[in-house]
Amino acid sequence: KTTTAGSISTESCSTENILTKKEGLLQDSIQAMKEKLRQDSIQWEKQLSAVTIKGTRSQFRQKNGGIVARISGTSLEKEPTATEVLAKLPGMFKDKDGKPQAFIGGAPEIYINERKVQDYSVVENLPVTQIKEVKVIHHPGAEYGNNVGCVLLITTKKNLQGLAIVENSGFLFDSYVSNNHDLDLTYTHGKMTYYGKLGYANWQGIWKEQDIATNYVSGSQAGDNTGNNAGNNATTYIASATLDCKHSYNDHFYWSAGADLALTEKQTIGVKYDGYNIHQPMPFKMTSYAMTNDHVDDNVTGDNKFLYYDWQHHVNAFYQGNYGEKWKLNIFGDFVKLHTEQGQFVDEISEKNLANGVSEEEARNKFTLLPQSDGTIWGAKARANYTINDKQTWMMGAEYNYVKSESRTDYTPADKGTSTHSITKENHAAVFAEYSLDFKPFSLRVGLRYEHVDSRLDSHAPLHRKYDNLYPSLLLSHQSGRFSQSLSYRSSETRPSFQELNTGTVYANRYMRQVGNSQLEPSQRHEFQYQASYGDLFLQASYTYVKDYITSIIEPYSDDPQTGYITWTNIDHCWNWGSFLG
């Protein structure tokens, strides 16, 4: 106690009493705290019982220079076909033939579980429910050929033990009813997996197209169909052809079988065989006319027909293995045998010839044109990946392809055109290497590819060409939360196809022929691309400079300016830019 004088005095009490009082106060405090926590807990449970916590996981993510799209468990899994899934990926759309196409890179090169797809029907008949994810690569690195502008890597779900039987059927109601059916069997027992597929598709429809060519001739100077007049006194020649098919159908049989063996947990081997047979008749009505200035010179009508017939056999073998924590090795081998026919049955009659007094039989132009080819492809590819550390990786590999094709074009009767026969052979070898560095928030990928190509065309005008080139590539990426962006550069080359080089003449219609150009040079491409994404938003922009750009043109025939020739030529250079936001 404190007195008024400020002195201090204490009451007499024992140490034991003090401790007893403290313990009592402590116990009371603990009990009060427990009761308070219990009441709070009850109150929180009541409040949380009415609360649902939701999280949103992005369907797309950036990974190693590509965009990985989850398919399983997302809205994309509800799409009717794999084609619809691929067409809805960032930067992709569906072209007029119903196949996925990149807005900037063109037709993609597609892989399923790292196996290259040789025939697109394999993708068409892949059940959507079996797709786990798809990686879209809009700036391919050194591993891929210089003619590849986009890559799609499809990963499927793992097979479970036991037998799985899947039957898929589909119907399309349009001008006609189309349908497709396939039966898919998979059996997994221990380390072995066996699988097979058998399918049939019938597609029916109508189509119509029109071709118009305009040629300008002034004296001995000829223009072209670009609209560039040869002078004020030029004569204008116009030729037009309309093809109208009222009923086209496609019978498509396809099949596959294979087996995979897991040698160990980290090593797998497998072999797969697949094939198809396609028969597609396309009868159509052909109407065409020719004009000189404003005067109609002739009208031609015809009941013509296209007949396409293709078959293919493909065998693939592979080995995939991991060695320790750093090495990964993939080896693939392919053999392809294929046959293609593109028959054309022509039965045309000219009003001009009838007006000149000739008989209907003499005025009729009737013949059969049958281009066909048989091809063989051998291919092998090996790729090794080495993890230097958690920030650096190294990839290297090599591939070789041998292609042989024998083509011939026959006219019946023989006097209706010039028959051709040619044999093409191509040896294509490549080695590639790529280094990746991750220094967050940035990552860098640098690649270099070397290609050697030896191609030979044996025909009435033999051609032999060799190409040896280096193709560098660079990719710089940045990641910050849900926002990612990348800048890339790639050098590549587009070589002319044998169709573009072959100087044999092919009949297109009454006023149009096709002939190749043996003097074509390869096109050199330099592409810069910027890509950005935030969540599910995607932006893509590119600029491409092309030296010796290959393009098709229509030139007038010297003896008949109303008849045009579709051919190909090199333009000194061109550039283009494109962008996509979605």
Which residues does each PLM region occupy?
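Short acidic/polar hinge/loop motifs at secondary-structure boundaries
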Residues: N113-P140
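Surface-exposed extracellular loop regions of Gram-negative outer-membrane beta-barrel proteins
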Residues: G149, T155-E167, K208, I212, ...
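Short, acidic, small-residue-rich periplasmic hinge/interaction motif at the N-terminus
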Residues: T2-S75, D95-D97, I137-H138
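Transmembrane beta-barrel wall of Gram-negative outer-membrane proteins
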Residues: Y176-Q204, K208, A222, T235-P283, ...
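N-terminal periplasmic accessory domains that precede
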Residues: C13, N17-L19, A50, A82-V85, ...
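Outer-membrane beta-barrel signature, preferentially recognizing the C-terminal barrel domain
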Residues: I423-E426, R465, E493-K547, G564-F580
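Face-selective signature of the C-terminal outer-membrane beta-barrel domain
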Residues: S256, D260-I278, N304-H460, Q479, ...
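Short strand-turn segments of transmembrane beta-barrel domains in outer membranes
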Residues: S72-G73, Q161-L185
